[in-house]
Every structure is written in structure tokens, then in C-alpha cells.
Amino acid sequence: MKNIFISGGGGYVGTNLVQELLKDDYKIIVLDTFWFGNYLKKNKNLKIIKKDLRNINKSDLNNIDCIIHLASIANDPAAALDAKLTWDVNVLATYKLINLAINQEVKKFIFASSGSVYGIKKEKKVTEELTLQPISEYNKSKMIAERVLLSYKKKIDLTILRPATICGYSPAMRLDVAINALTFGALQNNLITVYGGKQIRPNLTMHDMINAYKFFLKRSFKKNRSTENTIFNLGFENLSILNMAKRIRKSLQINSKILVKKTNDLRSYRQNSDRVIKKGFKPEKKIEDAIKEIKIKFLEKKIINKESYYRINTLKMIKV
């Protein structure tokens, strides 16, 4: 399985994933709008298609063995900005992609869903068996996309991943996700602003996210397998926002002030990832590793306060 198609391969996760897979001698086709910039390095085994996923056609998937579907309107604020765009990209384009994949006899399909599809849960162990109760346009669209894909599982080797909030460096950086935003605030302003603080959020390092894709890329499963062998949580550190702030300050070894502000957003999310661990996947990094990596890149001036690092700001500026 050497020919990999990655939708959204120019994004925060995709940019790192592409470079890692190229090291393993995969041939990669990336389809992306590159709304947030193109940071992919030229490579003889990399083909770039600058195109909106909604406009994908059959020829884009010629001779493809596996699709890794990353493209989406990501996070709650960005998705709420234009609900129609969110549903068109996250659901309808996913429907189009899976149909073309089956018509082109693609063997494997790996989908980047979200750990937020569970909604607000009181359970301490949020496992894959729990009922999905999404509360935002973003996680509702991810849930429906999952259901669309599951209706095709008899026809393709399907894996659905539900990652927690990802942290760590990427050339296509994001400063609108928890650990990254708090770390940047500490480095840039010597201030960590926390809203609420008691909310629990699951975390996943970029390193482990990339390794998870590589893990499932190498695994061969039967079509129409059970949900237990199809859907996997990927979240390994369930932490309060205030705890994150304290660990960031300790990891950076600076005396940043932690400013706690009131908020109406008291949502807490937890994830249990025992299922994927039982399959043989093991996380290798902690949030401290991501924090230290961000510090290094900040000192190298590879992370600055750039508009494209905030997804909602960029979407407001462009006409889609």
C-alpha cells in the first residue's frame, strides 16, 4: 500500500503527516485549498492538487490505495461562522469522496473525526460505546460524516479516529487550540490567560497523532468489521485548563502569570482510549514534549503571531 491520497494534507496535522510518510517512501497526493498557506516541501513522490474538496473528481483518485481524510472546517468557532459551508465541506464532500473512493476501488479509508462528538459527558471514562450528543455545528457535522461513512463499511476497509485536541508544532501552525495558545501566550506575553479553569479537556500530541495514522495505515482489516474494530478514541491526558496552564509554566521554566477569568463556557470533555491501546498502539509523548517543542520553534522565530494560525480569522478574510 504505497499510493496515499490525503485530503487537507496542507493543514496543521496534514503538513507534518505528509513529510513523515514521504520519509517512509510512500507516494503522496495532497488535495487542499491551502487557505492557511502551503508549507509542504517539494518532493518527487509528492503531487499537490490545489482544489476544494467539494470539487473533487474521479481522476484525482487514480491508482490510490488509501485515503486519509483530514479536510474539514475545523473547530467550533470556525464552523459556526458559516454553517452551510461547514456542512457542505464536512458532510457532503465526505459523501462525495467515499463514493468516488469505492468507484475507484480504493482499498482503505481513514477518517479524522473528533473526540468532541460525544458532547458533554459526566462519565469519567468516555468510551466509544457511549451515545454521541454533539452540541455544536462542528461536532454535529463530524457525527453525521461518521454515519455516512459507516453506511459504506461493507465496501471498504474503514477506520474512524476520534482525536482529542492536538498540541505541538507544525509549519502550518495553529494558535487557536488549548495547549498551543496557552504556551504561546506565556512565551510572547509572559501571561497565561485561563477562562474558567476547571473544565476538563483531553489532549493528544502531534507526535502521537502522526504515529496513529502510520499505525492504522499499516494495519489490514476486513471490510464490514465490527464497530469495536472501526472507531477509536485518541486522547491520553484529560486535564483541567488550569492544570494545563501550571504544567506549561513549569515546562517552560518561566514565572508567567496565570490570569483566571470568568467564562460561561464550562464544557468538559474526557476520553478513554483503552480500545486503541489494546490494538497495540502506544502513545509516546506527553504535553510537556509538545510545549518544549513549541518553545524551541518560538525562539527560532518559526512561530509568530500570524493571522493564518487562527482559523476563524482567516475564514473571515477570504471569500469561500
What are these regions (language model features)?
Residues 7, 31, 67-70, 109-114, ...:
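SDR active-site strand-loop-helix element
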Residues 44-55:
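Rossmann-fold cofactor-recognition segment
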Residues 53-89, 100:
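NAD(P)H-binding glycine-rich loop region in Rossmannoid oxidoreductase-like domains
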Residues 95-137:
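Conserved Rossmann-fold NAD(P)-dependent oxidoreductase catalytic core, especially the SDR/UDP-sugar
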Residues 141:
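Active-site helix of classical SDR
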Residues 147-201, 206-215, 248:
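NAD(P)-dependent short-chain dehydrogenase/reductase
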Residues 190, 194-320:
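C-terminal substrate-binding subdomain of Rossmann-fold SDR/epimerase-dehydratase oxidoreductases
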